[in-house]
């Protein structure tokens, strides 16, 4: 993998010094992951053991950098500062043994490590100055140098069995051209970009762009605003027409009764009523109490009518029955008359007496030429309309036709 592609996928621990400056820190165990990319930044090694002598720094650094293929040598040294560099080890295959090595800058590796003693902290500070190499890092070439052989002998003297075992494995892999370190495996799962051996996970160096979060916040705000707008629309009052009729208003069952004034359609105060023609009057004539009372009274007054001839010019069907008694006629007329200004009282001769009859002055009342008898054959729920039509026609008789009252079926007139 190229070095440029590694810059955005490796996590670097950052610490703050006492002077307030940001610095990169890495432990010796995690230094390999820090060194896997090219960068020109200072990498502070922490923790660093307490060295008794400056000569102990080089074996400690060789133990860290040899597995990475870096052969370090001392470039400059004094009592309080030591500078190490990378020795460029090249293969001798195809080279003339008599030719001298070139001392040009193109063959010099810029990799540097600085070790400085801090008088205040009483310890050595080790910093990687430049993590750039101008050559290929190969461990198999390092194993052939004299410094590496001295390093292995020093480990045997210290009885560092763990380090000896590790380097023996590296030598065996290098002899068989096996990879020394498991290569970084690219991951397209979306959770992590790169996964290294020994469960080392690399994360982005810099903070990820906040565009996705901003977009998410914007979408969330939009959705919330839409929900709020919908809730506000639902909470707005809408104009509604409410038709409420009192249950105990119809004593007689007729709309012209003075007690039915309060049964007018009540419309609540709304902002606007667009169409007043859409009022529902279906429940206005549905009065079960009246229908039940009407059926009961009808059974009391009902007599078997005798069929007779009927003419189309007559308003009511002429059914010859017994003459209507004066008491029942007075009850029907007295309870139907009202003090409403829509009615006009007139005197109608009936035999030897004069009866007061109320006439409706409204234009929508049925007349002699209207379809009064159209609902006579309907079901139980329409009996009220039939009776109302017949009685309204009775009230609109002229004085000349009032003698036909004797031919009206008394069953059609309620005793209420």
UniProtKB/Swiss-Prot annotation:
Changing residue 187 to A: Impairs domerization in the presence of Fe(2+) or a [2Fe-2S] cluster. Dimerization via the binding of Fe(2+) or a [2Fe-2S] cluster decreases the DNA-binding activity. Zn(2+) 1 binds at residues 53, 55. It is found in: Nucleus. DNA binds at residues 54-55, 58, 74-78, 81, 88, 119-120, 157, 159. InterPro entries: AFT. One of its GO terms (molecular function) is iron-sulfur cluster binding. Homodimer. Dimerization decreases the DNA-binding activity. This is Iron-regulated transcriptional activator AFT2. The gene is AFT2.
């Amino acid at each position: 993998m190229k070095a440029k592609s590694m810059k955005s996928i490796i996590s670097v621990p950052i610490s703050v010094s006492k002077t307030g400056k940001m610095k990169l820190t890495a432990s010796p165990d995690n230094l390999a992951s820090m060194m896997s990319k090219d960068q020109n930044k200072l990498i502070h090694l922490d923790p660093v053991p307490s060295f008794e002598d400056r000569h102990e720094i080089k074996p400690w650094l060789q133990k860290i950098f040899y597995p990475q293929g870096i052969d370090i040598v001392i470039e400059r040294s004094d009592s309080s500062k030591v500078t190490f560099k990378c020795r460029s080890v090249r293969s001798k295959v195809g080279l003339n043994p008599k030719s001298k090595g070139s001392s040009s800058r193109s063959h010099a590796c810029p990799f540097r490590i600085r070790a400085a003693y801090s008088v205040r902290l009483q310890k050595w500070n080790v910093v990687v100055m430049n993590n750039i190499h101008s050559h290929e890092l190969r461990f198999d070439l390092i194993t052939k140098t004299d410094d590496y052989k001295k390093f292995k002998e020093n480990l045997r003297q210290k009885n560092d069995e763990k380090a000896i075992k590790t380097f023996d494995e590296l030598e065996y892999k290098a002899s068989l051209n096996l990879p020394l370190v498991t290569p970084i495996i690219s991951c397209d799962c979306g959770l992590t970009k790169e996964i290294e051996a020994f469960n080392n996970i690399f994360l982005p160096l810099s903070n990820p762009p906040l565009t996705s979060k901003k977009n998410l916040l914007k979408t969330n705000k939009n959705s919330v605003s839409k929900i709020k707008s919908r809730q506000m629309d639902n909470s707005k009052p809408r104009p509604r027409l409410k038709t409420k009729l009192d249950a105990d208003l119809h004593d007689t069952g007729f709309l012209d009764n003075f007690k039915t004034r309060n049964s007018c359609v009540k419309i609540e105060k709304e902002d606007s009523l667009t169409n007043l023609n859409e009022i529902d009057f279906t429940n206005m004539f549905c009065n079960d109490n009246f229908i039940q009372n009407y059926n009961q009274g009808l059974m009391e007054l009902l007599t078997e009518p005798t069929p007779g001839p009927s003419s189309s010019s007559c308003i009511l069907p002429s059914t010859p029955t017994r003459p209507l008694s004066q008491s029942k006629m007075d009850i029907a007329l007295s309870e139907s008359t009202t003090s409403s200004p829509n009615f006009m009282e007139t005197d109608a001769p009936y035999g030897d007496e004069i009866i007061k009859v109320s006439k409706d002055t409204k234009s929508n009342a049925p007349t002699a030429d209207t379809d009064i008898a159209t609902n006579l054959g309907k079901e139980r729920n329409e009996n009220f309309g039939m009776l109302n039509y017949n009685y309204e026609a009775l009230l609109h008789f002229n004085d000349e036709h009032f003698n036909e009252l004797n031919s009206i079926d008394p069953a059609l007139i309620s005793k209420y």
